Amino acid sequence: MRNFVVETLPHNYSASYPDANFLKVVDSREALQRLAERHRDEFQIPVVGITGSNGKTIVKEWLSQLLSPDMVVTRSPRSYNSQIGVPLSVWLLDEQSEVALFEAGISKPGEMQALRDIIQPTIGVL
């Protein structure tokens, strides 16, 4: 089963994608962020939010290497730290996750609030 959040439905979508669900919304980025925020609400584990001008990925990978021998670590893949990458990263949380490491990067003023609401960090690293 595949699921899509879209602003415009594809032509002939039910025939072209018989095993898929489509959720039509006004703003797909906003919908993805709110869905990820609700998903994050389901987990009561330590969540480390990592931000800053440089070094986010290196710090995340370093912490993952330190923690992974003793815990199941869920982390942002590669440099998924954007308005779309963060929600996709948070979707990786599952019942096996014991700690999460998520990067948050911004490209313009005001973006960090949305990322903070999605990540809901219990620990912050700048």
Positions of the model-derived regions?
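N-terminal leader/targeting and accessory segments in enzymes
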Residues: 1-34
